[in-house]
Amino acid sequence: MFENSNDIQLLSVPRDPRRYLVLIRAGSKRRPSFFSEIPQGERQYDLAINYYATPHPDDILRNRAEVVFAGGRSKMHGAKRFFEATGLHNIYEGVLFLDDDIEILFNPDAFFAICDEYSLDLAQPALTPDCIDAMGLTREHPGLKLRTTNWVEVMAPFFRRAFLKEMLHSFDLSISGWGLDLYWGHHLADRWTAGIVDELLMRHTQVSNHETGAFYSYLRSIGVDPYEEMKSILTMIDTNPYIARPIRFVYRTYSFRA
C-alpha cells in the first residue's frame, strides 16, 4: 500500500476542513521538520501526509494527520490524484506542498497570513543561507520581508485556491518535478502574483544528488529523465531559457520608541 504507484489510496480525510492545508510527501525516514509531532493549540491549517513508503514507527502523522493517503508517483503527481479524488482543492483557501526533508522554521499560520496580506497566489519561504544547493534567488535576503518574483521553486510551493485550480492540470506533466515551476511561472502573466517570503525560513536538510540520490535512482528505475521533462515543458511554453528574476522588494520595518 505505502509505495510509489500511479494511483492513490485514501486513508483519512477531514469532515470539517480548516482554511489551509500543509501537504507533505513522506517516506520511511524520520522527518527533521516542525511536524515531528502534532502542533499544539489553535491552527488554521490541516496536515496531510502522502506516503510513498512504509511510515517510520515513530511517525505520529500516520494516525494523527487530518489527511492520510498513499501512492502517487511523486509529490505533485500524488497531489493531483488526491485533489481529483476529493475535490478539496475547491475548499482550502491555499495549500503548501512540502518534501519530507524540508525543515520549516516558522509557524505555517504566519506564512499563510503573509501570503494573504500581500495577495500571493504562488509563494515559498526563503531558504536558509546554509542550503548549499539552493539558487541565489531562493535564499534569504536579509532586510527584506519578501520579494515578488516570476518563479517559485517546486521544492515547497504554496498555491492560493484560484491559482491551484488553474494549474492542477499541470501537476503530472513532469514526474520528476523538473520544469513544473517554469510552467507555473510562465502562466503567472499579469494576472497572478508570486513571491519568496524572506521573513520566514526553511532549511533543505539533504543535498540533492542527481547520480546516487534515492529519488533520482527511483526516477531512472521508472524511465524518467528529469532533463527531458524540463526540456519538454520549455518547448511547451515556447520559452528557452526561462529567466527567473525578482520583480518588487518589500522591506522589513523596525520601530523605535522612547
Model-found features: residue ranges?
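Conserved catalytic core of nucleotide-sugar-dependent glycosyltransferases
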Residues: 104-181, 185-189
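C-terminal catalytic/acceptor-binding lobe
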Residues: 1-11, 17-20, 25, 174-258
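A short acidic, amphipathic alpha-helical/loop segment
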Residues: 33-38, 81-82, 109-114
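A structural signal for short, well-ordered beta-strand segments and their strand-loop junctions
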Residues: 97, 122-126, 193-198
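Short beta-strand-to-loop acidic/aromatic patch adjacent to the donor-nucleotide binding site
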Residues: 90-103
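Short, hinge-like loop/turn segments at secondary-structure boundaries
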Residues: 65-67, 140-143, 212-215
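Active-site-proximal specificity loops/subdomain of glycosyltransferases
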Residues: 35, 49-93
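N-proximal low-complexity "stem/linker" segments adjacent to membrane-targeting elements
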Residues: 1-60
